[in-house]
């Protein structure tokens, strides 16, 4: 029905593009007028636009003229003129939508249109890329255009100082990676002084490779962590225990099947991606750890460590999920195949894998701050994105980010030939067919790019090609350092490249070879340093004679190699262009489309074909049993391909099932994080008020009133007579911490006259008196500074503890689904109570610390920043303006507000 509707009326994207075309006509009509302007007149358009904005015109009013200005400036500065379809893409991005543009259609240039227009407001535009290389390249390259038009450009990459970051964010346009933007937001909400904040308000972001960032990475939260203080011994013991167990692996475990009857100690369910102990395994665990009952809440820690060891051994595969390099376990990105340095699995899984691999088990980290990309990017006032493949995920973009997807027509028609899938009975037959296809292409000089899903498979194919004497390049997580260079040359005559499905994303494969990378390689051979080569091929202005000489050499080499690659290009085109071979269908159709999209860029010829076996994970876990049975009944040879419409439909249906499951997982992550996000917003808003200089005296007095109320409600029974109240509790809770000793010692006559309201007033008056005495002792200015620092430190410490508690709660409530309770509703209810309790604890700690503080003016500290590195060490900063007055127990919280125990903080030398 939908297809019939689209035939008559066109698709949603067709209708949207048609609606935008009148705007494009207006832009194109302005071209002669813009071409007639001098450089100075063209530059003067920027202040003119800003003035018109201030006088009431809108960005939409300015759009046609502003886009025409950018188009002409780009022609003069970069030598590139925006095509009509690129103007359409620019309008879509300005409207806060996702523009799906095929590989090679010039997304980088398209972004300049909405970036310039929105930067005119002076509130900052963020251009988000997937890695530092692309952020640097695009900021330098497109920066020439923006600078020509009078706009400033900043760059956020790893390793910058706070001052450098602040300067970059204050620019009109800021390029950077999703990780850097997210981490800076978290760090800004951990500072003690407002001037240490680096970001401005989140105004407008354009996200490049938007599907990768907002969907593929949506399940992974950004976490700033410090080193925890828990021992790692239990991970080693749990690993030793799991090694003794007998395992049984199921493709899919029938719910009705009694796991108790299985002759194994633990079972792995591949489809559900779980590893669990059987009754036999539980019994062995209790014997090994010397405990009565593994399910007892007291044994939760042991149970957790065993579960992570089971996951490490049963589910996590070396050279697929992670690699071991330089005695470290490094995660492999499941989508790009890249090594993710600095990233660690959470909840102790990383430590369990370290124990499994026999490398040093690092201490578990403590989360200081975290946020998901979903919630970070939803904070922007306007958000848009670009990618080559978004349409298959349109439902998710709409429901979670309120973004619709518009497919932008290509400048030249796509002439790539996408062959139907070749399906084989087993993996051996499939790989033999792949090798035969490569040999056939290689004979005529047609370049081949083979996409694999794991290191193991790429190395297997490599060994098969070696046996047939076919020279080739392998690109996987182990050899990713030269990723861009290897991918760039994948279009050379006769080239054969094996790569993970999404490797080298952002690098164009040019038929005949890439002269830029060839020139760089030659410069390395001639002894040029890497930093000089980067400067020589970059776009920054310079007067450095060494770099100017290097640029001259580079230009000469580039021109020489360009002649060679242009001649070779003709031969590659004659051979059929780049041939893409997929060796397995990915869980997501989008990733398959990305692999296909590497060929046929800008009207180039090309071919693609996927080779599939019934032993592939997707078919094994999600293909229908009826289909598998039918294929078995045919009794085909392993080298005989199966081609049938039913089979193609089954593959697509399997992918749709997995996509739906993964969408449900991401949606579940968001449901839980939305609860946390509301609490995060409250805490961060409170912090910002403090940082912005709000007078805290009223807040502190209000806290004292709340504490007095809490004490009376907690210890005074319903009976109005004081004899029935818990005086021991009242005194131990209140005296020393909030009021001087003896304050609550009443005579018999006073007791007779006492009621709850009078007791509350006595406690409050005593706290207020002590507070006023402190202010006289310190002076108002120092008192306000003390209040500010103490409040921020206590809030940060309690928030960190709350994050841990919420994490534990989230894991715990999931089990309640078995009791027919909605885990999300349970989580919301209990997390609210925990948040209220955290706020009470913040108030009581802040008041207690302030009332018991003595300032030693000779030990006033220098100001320190809170969270410089990604893995921030928390608790060392601004902790010594305060030292104890009363004797503090060594295991009590330090009164300085650091959140550490006294013996590990100010009492460390005692």
UniProtKB/Swiss-Prot annotation:
Kindly list the places in or outside the cell where this protein is found, as annotated in its UniProt entry: Cell membrane; Cytoplasm
Q: EC number(s) in its UniProt entry?
A: 7.4.2.8
Q: Which biological process annotations from GO are given for this protein?
A: intracellular protein transmembrane transport; protein import; protein targeting; protein transport by the Sec complex
The UniProt GO MF terms for this protein read: ATP binding; metal ion binding; protein-exporting ATPase activity
Q: Where does Zn(2+) bind?
A: 894, 896, 905-906
Cofactor binding, per record: May bind 1 zinc ion per subunit.
Instruction: Name where it mostly resides.
Output: membrane
The cofactors it requires, by name, are:
Zn(2+)
- Which Pfam families does the record associate with it? P-loop_SecA, SEC-C, SecA_DEAD, SecA_PP_bind, SecA_SW
Q: Where does ATP bind?
A: 86, 104-108, 508
Its function, per the record, reads: Part of the Sec protein translocase complex. Interacts with the SecYEG preprotein conducting channel. Has a central role in coupling the hydrolysis of ATP to the transfer of proteins into and across the cell membrane, serving as an ATP-driven molecular motor driving the stepwise translocation of polypeptide chains across the membrane.
Q: How does it assemble?
A: Monomer and homodimer. Part of the essential Sec protein translocation apparatus which comprises SecA, SecYEG and auxiliary proteins SecDF. Other proteins may also be involved.
Q: Which family does it belong to?
A: Belongs to the SecA family.
Protein's recorded name = Protein translocase subunit SecA
């Amino acid at each position: 029905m939908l297809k019939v509707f689209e035939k008559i009326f066109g698709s949603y994207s067709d209708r949207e593009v048609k609606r935008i075309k009148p705007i494009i006509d207006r832009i194109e009509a302005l071209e002669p007028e813009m071409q007639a302007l001098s450089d100075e007149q063209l530059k003067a358009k920027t202040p003119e636009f800003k003035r018109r904005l201030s006088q009431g015109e809108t960005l939409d009013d300015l759009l046609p003229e502003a886009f025409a200005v950018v188009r002409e400036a780009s022609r003069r500065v970069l030598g590139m003129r925006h095509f009509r379809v690129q103007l359409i893409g620019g309008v879509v991005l300005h409207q806060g939508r996702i523009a799906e543009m095929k590989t090679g259609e010039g997304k980088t240039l398209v972004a300049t249109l909405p970036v310039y227009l929105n930067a005119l407001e002076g509130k900052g535009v963020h251009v988000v890329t997937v890695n530092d290389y692309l952020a640097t390249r695009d900021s330098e390259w497109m920066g020439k255009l923006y600078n020509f038009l009078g706009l400033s450009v900043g760059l956020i990459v790893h390793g910058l100082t706070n001052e450098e970051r602040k300067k970059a964010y204050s620019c009109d346009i800021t390029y950077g990676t999703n990780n850097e933007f997210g981490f800076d937001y978290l760090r800004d909400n951990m500072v003690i002084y407002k001037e240490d904040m680096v970001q401005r308000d989140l105004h407008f972001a354009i996200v490049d490779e938007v599907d990768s960032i907002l969907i593929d990475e949506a399940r992974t939260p950004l976490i700033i962590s410090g080193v925890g203080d828990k021992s790692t011994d239990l991970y080693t013991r749990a690993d030793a225990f799991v090694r003794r167990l007998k395992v049984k692996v199921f493709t899919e475990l029938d719910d009705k099947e009694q796991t108790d009857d299985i002759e194994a100690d633990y079972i792995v369910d591949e489809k559900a991606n779980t590893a669990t102990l059987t009754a036999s395994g539980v019994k062995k665990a209790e014997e090994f750890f010397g405990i009565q009952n593994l399910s007892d809440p007291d044994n939760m820690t042991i149970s957790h460590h065993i579960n992570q060891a089971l996951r490490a051994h049963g589910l996590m595969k070396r050279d697929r999920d992670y690699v071991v390099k330089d005695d470290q376990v490094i995660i492999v990105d499941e989508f790009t195949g890249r090594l993710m340095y600095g990233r660690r699995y959470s909840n102790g899984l990383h430590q369990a894998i370290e124990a499994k691999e026999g490398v040093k088990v690092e201490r578990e980290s403590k989360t200081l701050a975290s946020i998901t990309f979903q919630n970070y990017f939803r904070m922007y006032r306007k958000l848009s994105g670009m990618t080559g493949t978004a349409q298959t995920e349109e439902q998710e973009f709409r429901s979670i980010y309120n973004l619709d997807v518009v497919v932008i027509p290509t400048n030249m028609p796509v002439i790539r030939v996408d062959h139907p899938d070749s399906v084989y009975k087993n993996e051996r037959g499939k790989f033999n067919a792949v090798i035969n296809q490569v040999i056939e292409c290689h004979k005529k000089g047609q370049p081949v790019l083979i996409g694999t899903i794991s290191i193991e498979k790429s190395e297997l194919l490599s060994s098969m090609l070696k046996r047939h004497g076919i020279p080739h390049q392998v690109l996987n997580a182990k050899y990713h350092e030269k990723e861009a260079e290897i991918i760039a040359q994948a279009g050379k005559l006769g080239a054969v490249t094996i790569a993970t499905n999404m490797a080298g994303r952002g690098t164009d494969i040019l038929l005949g070879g890439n002269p830029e990378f060839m020139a760089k390689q030659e410069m390395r051979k001639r002894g040029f340093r890497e930093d000089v080569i980067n400067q020589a091929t970059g776009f920054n202005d310079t007067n450095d004679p060494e770099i100017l000489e290097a640029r001259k050499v580079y230009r000469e080499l580039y021109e020489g190699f360009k002649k060679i690659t242009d001649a070779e290009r003709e031969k590659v085109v004659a051979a059929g262009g780049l041939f893409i071979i997929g060796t397995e269908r990915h869980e997501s159709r989008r990733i398959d489309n990305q692999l296909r999209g590497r060929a046929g860029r800008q009207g180039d010829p090309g071919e693609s074909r996927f080779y599939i076996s019934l032993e592939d994970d997707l078919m094994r876990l999600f293909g229908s049993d009826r289909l598998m049975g039918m294929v078995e009944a045919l009794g085909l040879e392993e080298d005989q391909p199966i081609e049938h419409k039913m089979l193609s439909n089954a593959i697509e249906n399997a992918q749709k099932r997995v996509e739906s499951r993964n969408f449900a997982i991401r949606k579940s992550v968001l449901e839980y994080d939305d609860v946390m996000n509301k609490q995060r917003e409250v805490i961060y808003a409170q912090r910002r008020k403090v940082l912005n200089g709000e007078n805290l005296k009223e807040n502190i007095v209000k806290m004292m009133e709340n504490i007095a109320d809490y004490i009376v409600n907690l210890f005074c029974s319903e009976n109005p007579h004081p004899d029935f109240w818990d005086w021991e509790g009242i005194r131990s809770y209140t005296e020393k911490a909030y009021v001087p000793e003896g304050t609550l010692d009443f005579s018999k006559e006073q007791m007779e006259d006492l009621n709850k309201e009078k007791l509350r007033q006595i406690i409050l008056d005593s706290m207020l008196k002590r507070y006023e005495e402190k202010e006289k002792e310190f002076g108002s200015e120092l008192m306000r500074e003390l209040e500010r620092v103490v409040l921020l430190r206590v809030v940060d410490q309690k928030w960190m503890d709350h994050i841990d508690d919420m994490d534990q709660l989230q894991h715990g409530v999931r089990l309640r689904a078995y009791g027919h309770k909605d885990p999300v509703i349970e989580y919301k209810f209990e997390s609210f109570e925990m948040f209220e309790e955290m706020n009470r604890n913040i108030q009581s700690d802040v008041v207690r610390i302030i009332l018991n503080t003595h300032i030693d003016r000779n030990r006033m500290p220098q100001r320190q920043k809170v969270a410089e590195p990604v893995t921030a060490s928390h608790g060392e900063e601004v902790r010594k303006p305060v030292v104890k007055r009363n004797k503090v127990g060594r295991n009590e919280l330090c009164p300085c507000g650091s959140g550490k125990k006294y013996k590990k903080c100010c009492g460390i030398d005692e």
